[in-house]
Curated annotation (Swiss-Prot):
UniProt GO BP: translation
Protein name: Small ribosomal subunit protein uS14
Source species of the chain: Dictyoglomus thermophilum (strain ATCC 35947 / DSM 3960 / H-6-12)
Quaternary organization: Part of the 30S ribosomal subunit. Contacts proteins S3 and S10.
Keyword set, alphabetical order: Metal-binding, Ribonucleoprotein, Ribosomal protein, RNA-binding, rRNA-binding, Zinc
Biological function: Binds 16S rRNA, required for the assembly of 30S particles and may also be responsible for determining the conformation of the 16S rRNA at the A site.
Family: Belongs to the universal ribosomal protein uS14 family. Zinc-binding uS14 subfamily.
């Protein structure tokens, strides 16, 4: 979970649009970000395995 100070920092409006960057909505991780879901790969996997992401299934072939 992201620190309170980090969350407050992200919510403040940015002076310049270029300064915005992608972070996971759950844990705040900047790497392994999946744009379509707004999550990092770890949180995405966790939620997908629980069945909490609609339309996402584990691949098998």
């Amino acid at each position: 979970m992201a620190k309170k100070s980090q969350i407050v920092k992200w919510l403040k409006p940015k002076k310049y649009k270029v300064r915005e960057y992608n972070r996971c909505r759950i844990c705040g991780r900047p790497r392994g970000y999946i744009r379509k879901f707004g999550l990092c790969r770890l949180c995405f996997r966790e939620l997908a395995l629980k069945g909490e992401l609609p339309g996402v299934r584990k691949a098998s072939w």
